[in-house]
Amino acid sequence: MTAHFDRSEFTCKCGCDKSDISPDLVNKLEQIYAYFARTPTGCKAIVITSGIRCSTYSPKVGGYSNDAHTKGIAADIVVYKADGTRYVAEQIAAVAEKCGFSGIGLMNGACHVDIRNKNNYVNAHWFGDERTGNNSITSFLGYLPPLATSQSVTASKHTLTVNFDGKTIFEKEF
């Protein structure tokens, strides 16, 4: 699907195999990955804890039968730093806002992101905290992690290495 995401990560967890996720959502998730990769703590992976859901399964896990997950325009994500620890939900939300996500919700240990708009969803914009029920957050940008001050990318015939602030944050052998 993309460099950091596979279609199977987005498939409905009930076993129905529904997996018609929006390519625009996946592209925006790649933007989140790219932003975190440029921070001093890097990005090891973004894990999709919930992608598309069928209308039967979504209410069973706290959603609705016609929510953004059922439309293929939402994902619940956890972002891991290069050292394997997690970014906090507020940092993920801040980066998602910077990347243009229009639906963002803080969750315990994860962050809901979606690409709702007036054509595909009842309310075109929503920032909230699902932990507290506060559905009127105006911005998360105060939690935006800083970018690295130096970066380099090197490639040999068989290895791609990305360094930020002197630390290797990504390495892939081909």
Model feature map: region roles:
Residues 49-76:
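Short, surface-exposed glycine/acidic/tryptophan-bearing loops
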Residues 1-45:
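Active-site acidic/histidine clusters and adjacent loop/turn architecture
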Residues 66, 71, 79-165, 170:
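Catalytic cores and adjacent binding grooves of peptidoglycan-active enzymes
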Residues 46, 75, 111:
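A broad, low-specificity signal marking well-ordered, structured residues that form hydrophobic/aromatic
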Residues 173-174:
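N-terminal accessory interaction module
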Residues 40-51, 101-108:
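Surface-exposed patches in mature extracellular/periplasmic domains of secreted proteins
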Residues 16-20, 74-81:
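The substrate-binding groove and active-site-proximal loops of carbohydrate-active enzymes
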